[in-house]
Amino acid sequence: MKTLYLLRHAKSSWKDSGLEDFDRPLSKRGRAAAKAMGEYLARHRIVPAQVLCSPAKRTRETLERLQDGIGPAVPVRFEKVVYMADAPTLLRRLRRLNDTLASAMLVGHNPGLEQLALALAAEEENGLRRELAAKFPTGSLAVIEADVERWADLKPGCGRITAFTRAKDLGAE
């Protein structure tokens, strides 16, 4: 069993219209939401074995505010392939993870994260897949338990969404 944490970056700022998409920072609301998610991770003792993060400014800032929750010892890799990647690209990257890792967190962007979550998750009765399909807002975390022993075996329908937490669920939006 492998556990995958898919975290969409928190709300970004559109104040400076001259910035490239890659360079947009978090908004005030986004900073608060990312901090609240870090506290949620700490409360629930969610500590991934590895973090793969888009190098975009808003994803890096989101991760910085989570680090109190997951701790500084978690290895983090900033990978350009995660920036604005589609689901097949993200899946290919995850399949290359070291099998000694029981869990991994992907901090990235939509629509790729949402598409990946929906592809990996089989239909389920708990309603979380339907909730996520309706909207995977900024600052949200989807937890997927994949019924595989090796990351290379990740494929559509191999997992189930065991938790879906939005910033608004934490009182941060």
How would you label these PLM feature ranges?
Residues 91-97:
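Short, surface-exposed amphipathic charged segments that create phosphate/polyanion-binding patches used
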Residues 2-81, 85, 89, 125-126, ...:
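Active-site-proximal alpha-helix that buttresses catalytic centers in soluble enzyme cores
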Residues 44-46, 97-102:
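Glycine-rich phosphate-binding loop signature in dinucleotide/nucleotide-binding domains
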Residues 157-173:
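Charged phosphate-binding loop/patch that engages nucleotide di/tri-phosphates or the phosphate backbone
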Residues 4, 103-105, 141:
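Residue-level preference for the first positions of well-ordered beta-strands
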